[in-house]
Amino acid sequence: MKKRWFLQVSLILFILVSFFQPLQLVSGQVDAPEAIVVQLKGPLTPVWSGYLQRGINRAMSTGAGLLIIELNTPGGSVDLMNHLVQQILASPVPVVVYVTPRGAMAASAGTLLVLSGHIAAMAP
């Protein structure tokens, strides 16, 4: 009788643990913050400033945990670069500057954009 009671209790516990374990994993995935991606490609232009600011604003309004800037530029105006760097430094959302795709560059003023991010990364 004791053996049967033990088997029944064990089976019930196994079923309960099996049932609730997947729910716990799913709830952890739902709470993960998203990342906003902004692509800046080509020579630095004044349009980039507004585009970058919209990306920062969107990251803040959606509660994103990260803003990723995909960068591929030969550079551009020093004044514009300074403005973009100030936007990145003032961002309340962490900024990753990712030089991509393979063979992309961040030359001249683009180098300073990469250095202004919280994290700098480059495609192989």
Predicted ranges, named:
Residues M1-W5:
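Positively charged n-region of N-terminal signal peptides that target proteins for export
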Residues F19-P124:
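Soluble extramembrane regions of membrane proteins in the secretory/endomembrane system
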Residues V9-P22:
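Bacterial N-terminal signal peptides
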